[in-house]
């Protein structure tokens, strides 16, 4: 097998013509396919960038909403703790006031009862003394002593 280097005898010219025609026809066809593919890829990239930008904006908004919600939750927690402390303090003060009122009422009741008992004892002592004096008076008071008592009482009444 020998190589034939004679261009006229070979199909080089034919090959060049066929290759030229193929390149000329396929350039439009393959170029269109490649151009459409390039446009589709560029469009997908633009869509991805748009979605990324939208997602970034939504993430930023969600993060700011989360921060605001956390601040609101912290404020609610602090307000709740303050309110619970105020309610607890108010309850303690009411309990102390109620206990003081009960104690004061008990002391007043005890004082009133003591005063009532003192009055009863005074009356009973006075009645007992009067009864004793009335029982002892006739034996101790003779006519002469009775006259002196009456005179001294009249003198005391005149001086008064």
Curated annotation (Swiss-Prot):
It holds the Pfam family ATP-synt_B. The keyword Transport applies. Keywords: ATP synthesis, CF(0), Hydrogen ion transport, Ion transport, Membrane, Thylakoid, Transmembrane, Transmembrane helix, Transport. F(1)F(0) ATP synthase produces ATP from ADP in the presence of a proton or sodium gradient. F-type ATPases consist of two structural domains, F(1) containing the extramembraneous catalytic core and F(0) containing the membrane proton channel, linked together by a central stalk and a peripheral stalk. During catalysis, ATP synthesis in the catalytic domain of F(1) is coupled via a rotary mechanism of the central stalk subunits to proton translocation. Belongs to the ATPase B chain family. The chain crosses the membrane at residues 13-33. InterPro entries: ATP_synth_b/b'su_bac/chlpt. Its main location: membrane. It comes from Parasynechococcus marenigrum (strain WH8102). Disulfide bonds: none annotated. F-type ATPases have 2 components, F(1) - the catalytic core - and F(0) - the membrane proton channel. F(1) has five subunits: alpha(3), beta(3), gamma(1), delta(1), epsilon(1). F(0) has four main subunits: a(1), b(1), b'(1) and c(10-14). The alpha and beta chains form an alternating ring which encloses part of the gamma chain. F(1) is attached to F(0) by a central stalk formed by the gamma and epsilon chains, while a peripheral stalk is formed by the delta, b and b' chains. This is ATP synthase subunit b. The keyword Transmembrane applies. NCBIfam families: PRK07352.1. One of its GO terms (cellular component) is plasma membrane-derived thylakoid membrane. GO terms for molecular function: proton-transporting ATP synthase activity, rotational mechanism. It is found in: Cellular thylakoid membrane.
